[in-house]
UniProtKB/Swiss-Prot annotation:
Keywords linked to the UniProt accession: Amino-acid biosynthesis, Cytoplasm, NADP, Oxidoreductase, Proline biosynthesis
UniProt name for this protein: Gamma-glutamyl phosphate reductase
GO molecular function: glutamate-5-semialdehyde dehydrogenase activity; NADP binding
PANTHER family on file: DELTA-1-PYRROLINE-5-CARBOXYLATE SYNTHASE, GLUTAMATE SEMIALDEHYDE DEHYDROGENASE
GO cellular component, one term: cytoplasm
GO terms of biological process kind: L-proline biosynthetic process
Main enzyme class: oxidoreductase
Lineage start: Bacteria, Pseudomonadati, Thermodesulfobacteriota, Desulfobacteria, Desulfobacterales
Catalytic activity entry: L-glutamate 5-semialdehyde + phosphate + NADP(+) = L-glutamyl 5-phosphate + NADPH + H(+)
Compartments, record wording: Cytoplasm
Length: 418
């Protein structure tokens, strides 16, 4: 079987599996998720052994520490996967939910109901926990899933796929409801992106090059999880202790994730007091600073930033720093270099906070908080499949509801159109 025919067969089987899955009860879907959680707990040693194969290859290839962190399945990661499954079980099933109902003057009773999207293909990098998260959310929303993780996580994703398949089979649901592409060949992605006859939506989640590749080659609608060039703007008046804490958390808690801060913008009036303190905190946290000329004058140990730094998602302990004249210049910078992901203002001026909220168009705009809160769980939405930077269909964290669509149901008593 050629690669092209293998990928088409996987997509065809996913489409076939999606039909009965769309009408599966909430109890049935929750039972599958509980079985996956049980399988993860029982398969801990085997999962860790397969993950070690990926980690060894990553270290041998010189992968960065931040990327290795994303690739690692620790005890904590496994517990987080199981916790995530239980959280999805606890969420209400969106399928069949009536989002609106009304009666027309001619007596027609009209309702709008949530339905599964169908077959979702997800293409992502590094983090094998995404395999479990994506499978859980797609299944709970009644969708079949085709998953293609990064080749660097091949062994980890393969064992996770087996556990998911076993859980499906135990409950009497087709294993084809969740499939992980069984090959590392990048051409498999290209072939997958041509299966518009069977796949309804593609969700890429990874670096800029992956997103651009998917958008360029897909004949299927794409919901982008684009890069996170996230900003914190420190306004002319603010609580500087809070500002330092926010910036350290936003940059260092998990530097390799999409909602980490990449650029710090500082008002010129507060910069002489704030930046030396911030630089000291960054230095203690081993964060490399890359600054504009005005920043370098105040922080001699910083490296000079060039134009590419302002649009770079470092995913590492690096931050670009720019001193701006005022709020307007900060927002203009974000409009040019931001990625519509997450942007925050730290300020004591309510009018400036409101202007920032109304002007900046990112999927999460924050006031006096860390960028790290742009997350489905932290926002109280439950689990998420990613953070969409597309405005069509979904914008921001994508939970269960964002993995469904709607249909109209019209009930009459023999009415005909006049």
């Amino acid at each position: 079987m050629t690669l092209a025919s293998m990928i088409e067969d996987i997509a065809r089987r996913a489409r076939t599996a999606a039909r009965p899955l769309a009408t599966a009860s909430a109890d049935t879907k929750n039972t599958v998720l509980a079985e996956i959680a049980r399988g993860l707990a029982h398969g801990k040693r085997e999962i860790e052994a397969e993950n070690q194969k990926d980690l060894k290859a990553a270290r041998d290839s010189g992968m960065s520490a931040a990327m290795i962190d994303r690739l690692t399945i620790s005890d904590q990661t496994l517990e987080s996967m199981i916790k995530g499954l239980n959280q999805v079980i606890a969420l209400p099933d969106p399928v069949g939910r009536i989002t609106g109902a009304w009666t027309r003057p001619n007596g027609l009773e009209i309702s709008k109901r949530r339905i599964p999207l169908g077959v979702i293909a997800m293409i992502y990098e590094s983090r094998p926990n995404v395999t479990v998260d994506a499978a859980a959310l797609c299944l709970k929303a009644g969708n079949a899933a085709i998953l293609r993780g990064g080749s660097e996580a091949f062994f980890s994703n393969t064992i996770l796929a087996r556990i998911i398949g076993n859980a499906l089979e135990t409950v009497g649901i087709s294993r084809d409801s969740v499939q992980v592409l069984p090959v590392k060949d990048r051409q498999a992605i290209t072939e997958l992106l041509q299966q518009e006859a069977y796949i309804d939506l593609v969700i890429p989640r990874g670096g800029e090059s992956l997103i651009r590749f998917v958008v360029k080659h897909s004949t299927i609608p794409v919901l982008k999880h684009y890069k996170g060039v996230c900003h914190v703007y420190v306004d002319e008046t603010c609580n500087m202790d809070e500002a330092v804490d926010i910036c350290i958390n936003a940059k260092t808690q998990r530097p390799g994730v999409c909602n980490a801060m990449e650029t710090l913008l500082v008002h010129e009036r507060i910069a002489p007091l704030f930046l030396p303190r911030m630089a000291q905190a960054f230095s203690a946290a081993k964060v490399e600073m890359r600054g504009c000329p005005a920043t370098l004058a105040m922080v001699p140990q910083a490296l000079p930033a060039d134009e590419t730094d302002w649009s770079t998602e470092y995913l590492d302990l690096i931050v670009s720093v720019k001193i701006v004249k005022d709020l307007a210049q900060a927002m203009a910078h974000i409009a040019v270099f931001g990625s519509d992901h997450t942007d925050v203002i730290v300020t004591d001026i309510p009018e400036n906070a409101e202007t920032f909220i109304n002007t900046v168009s990112s999927s999460m705009v924050g006031v006096n908080v860390s960028t790290r809160f742009n997350d489905g769980g932290e926002l109280g939405l439950g689990a998420e499949i990613g953070i969409s930077t597309s405005r069509l269909h979904a914008f921001g964290p994508m939970g269960l509801e964002e993995l469904t669509s709607t249909k109209f149901v019209v009930v009459g008593k023999g009415q005909t159109r006049q």
